[in-house]
Regions:
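Phosphate/pyrophosphate-binding active-site segments
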Residues: 2-8, 159, 196, 217, ...
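N-terminal alpha/beta PP-like core and its mobile active-site loop of ThDP/TPP-dependent enzymes
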Residues: 2-353, 409, 474, 493, ...
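Conserved structured core elements
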Residues: 11, 15, 34, 213, ...
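Generic structural marker for isolated residues within well-ordered, non-membrane alpha-helices
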Residues: 142, 246, 403, 547-548
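Conserved short loop/turn motifs at secondary-structure junctions
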Residues: 234-239, 390-391, 480-482
Length: 607
């Protein structure tokens, strides 16, 4: 039967759901559909045909982890949540560590799942029709993800589906931002309802909070009067305006240093002399301070390894200063305030600039000496980092020379999506990210995030560049083989190929997981595992998969060849490299293949 002869689909709860997403500013929906979605499928087709330019873009994702990670990556660039659609309890469970990542990483994502029909005998449209409808009914489906979500809800009637979506998005977009989850049964999704809309101006999130005047004065004076003030941050760079304000603060207070313990965003430019770089809460700078200012930071130090001196003054400003989702979190502070980072930094910079007493104090020659010493230390650190990269053509590859080569070979506009786990800190030292938004890390611990997140980041950048002809920014994913394997890489590679989302992927193949060995050595430095092989402690991936071949096969490009000759006919190109010379030659292809031709490329780096 021709499409024109088909009966026009009714306006249902499912259609109103997608309409609500679009009206709220959601432009993409990453889907993994199932038996709970007949009305959803009808709505998708109806929307595509009747209002193609005012309907979310529907992206098929063979694995749920791909779907939620793509939405996660998109939101980190755009600042706007996107939608994920999965089926019943099993699809919800398959979101797994992706929900953890969005929750811990403070990323807004709207998740929708169908529920099993609640009628058995065809009483209403959507009743049970298949065997699995008795097997997939969980006693409390929302409980699967409730402890990771800012809000969980259920659509019980189509008459208020848009209000339910609006309320969920208010939670997703209010600090601390994070995932929300809404579910609905088949019968409800099939319900016919009259069309309606909401005034979106009345469905806004909670606005940013500011510091009270006494807190501004206390923090500003403590920073200026301290001999070794230290700012420890983690998420503040998610707001791209914050790094510039932190620079202004560091320029006002010579000697102040800034340390990033989360690595999820560029919170402070590496090139600035105040930068202490990125470490996962373990750096000696926290021991060498008399005043610590914690700014949007979950884990500022490891209490058993590098706590600040007991005499240090500690102030904490955060959108969630009590870390309400972390039961054991005992970091002390002499003052805590719930406030927006950008607003708080603006207040502090303005106060210091306009306070006459502080201005006079900062004119003391001692401050100039502190600033000069800070610059000297930073220059020495940069020299030490540069010396770590051995770049002779025959040199084997490691995190230091890989990072150095990526920094010099790729455009300055490159956005790095990093999930290198044990190599991330070394990569940060070598890449030295300074442009806001140029470095994006998960900020959580659900490995495999970057496979989908890099695609979401690139999609968001492509949308931003759509009004700028000729602008084709590069996204470079750097991922360890353990993380790459952990989250259905074939699904992400297929999505990249189908929807032509070009990303340069660097897989660091060190033959397995290295982080568990590091963890064991911290607890049992002389234990049995310390002298055991990787196979004995079950962290080896040997014989190693051929990730270059996997990339080409998953993208439908044929078998991987592992050579260096380009194939313009294939959308995905996979290469294995072993030496500095190999990597240099491979990176020479990136400008033409990934940026200009907008095709995918995966480099498997043998460590």
């Amino acid at each position: 039967m021709a499409a024109s002869q088909l009966t026009q689909a009714p306006y249902t709860t499912a259609f109103a759901l997608f309409e609500a997403l679009w009206e709220a500013g959601i432009t993409a929906c990453f889907v993994n559909v199932g038996s709970d979605h007949p009305s959803v499928l009808e709505a998708i087709v109806k929307g595509k045909r009747e209002r193609p330019n005012a309907w979310p873009r529907i992206i098929t994702c063979p694995a749920e982890m791909t779907a939620i990670s793509m939405a996660d990556g998109y939101a980190r660039v755009s600042g706007r949540p996107q939608a994920v659609l999965v089926h019943v309890d099993v699809g919800t469970q398959a979101l797994g560590h992706g929900v953890h990542n969005a929750s811990v990483g403070r990323v807004p994502v709207f998740i929708f799942a169908g529920m099993c029909p609640y009628t058995e005998a065809g009483e209403v449209t959507g009743s049970r029709t298949e065997y699995m409808h008795w097997l997939q009914e969980a006693p409390d489906q929302k409980a699967i993800v409730r402890q990771y979500c800012r809000y969980t809800g259920e659509v019980r009637t189509g008459l208020n589906v848009k209000q339910t979506v609006g309320r969920a998005l208010q939670f997703a977009n209010s600090a601390p931002r994070g995932p929300v989850y809404v579910a609905a049964a088949r019968e409800v999704l099939a319900q016919e309802v009259p069309p309606y809309s909401l005034d979106q101006a009345q469905w806004v999130p909670v606005g940013p909070g500011a510091l009270p005047p006494d807190a501004v004065a206390a923090i500003a004076r403590a920073l200026v009067q301290a001999r070794r003030p230290l700012v420890v941050t983690g998420y503040s760079g998610r707001d791209r305006r914050c790094p510039g304000l932190l620079v202004a603060l560091a320029d006002l207070i010579p000697g102040m240093r800034v340390h990033d313990t989360g690595g999820s965003d560029v919170c402070f430019p590496f090139e600035h002399p105040a930068s202490e770089g990125f470490r996962l809460a373990l750096d000696e700078c926290t021991r060498d301070t008399d005043m610590v200012f914690l700014l949007d930071c979950d884990v500022p130090w490891i209490p058993a390894r590098n706590p600040p001196p007991e005499h240090a003054t500690i102030y904490h400003v955060d959108c969630d200063p009590l870390n309400q989702q972390i039961p054991v979190s005992f970091f002390p502070a002499h003052g805590r305030w719930k406030a927006d980072s950008f607003t708080a930094l603006s207040q502090l910079v303005e106060y210091i600039r306009n306070d006459a007493a502080l201005a006079r104090q900062l004119q003391d020659p001692e401050y100039a000496a502190r600033g000069a010493a800070r610059e000297k230390v930073h220059a020495s650190r940069l020299a030490e980092i540069a010396a770590q990269a051995r770049l002779g053509d025959d040199e084997p590859l490691n995190a230091a020379n890989i990072g150095s080569l990526l920094k010099t070979a790729l455009p300055e506009s490159t956005t790095f999506v990093i999930e290198a786990v044990t190599a991330a800190q070394t990569l940060s030292d070598q890449l030295q990210p300074s442009r806001p938004g140029s470095w994006i890390n998960c900020g959580a611990t659900g490995i495999g995030w970057s496979n989908g997140a890099a695609l979401g980041v690139k999609m968001a950048l492509m949308d931003l560049e759509s009004d700028q002809p000729g602008e084709h920014s590069l996204v470079c994913q750097v991922v360890g083989d353990g993380s790459f394997m952990c989250a259905a890489p074939s699904s992400a590679l297929w999505v990249a190929s189908k929807y032509e989302v070009p990303v340069l992927t660097i897989v660091l193949n060190n033959g397995g997981w290295k982080a568990p060995r590091n963890s064991a050595q911290l607890v049992y430095p002389d234990g049995l595992a310390a002298g055991a092989t990787d196979d004995e402690i079950n962290i080896s991936f040997c014989p190693t998969p051929n990730y270059a071949a996997l990339a080409e096969a998953a993208a439908g490009s044929g078998a991987g060849r592992g050579g260096l000759a380009d194939d313009d006919g294939a959308w995905m190109r996979g290469l294995r490299v072993r030496t500095v010379a190999d990597l240099k030659r491979a990176l020479e292809m990136v400008e033409s293949r990934v940026i200009q031709q907008r095709k995918g490329m995966l480099l498997e780096v043998m460590l």
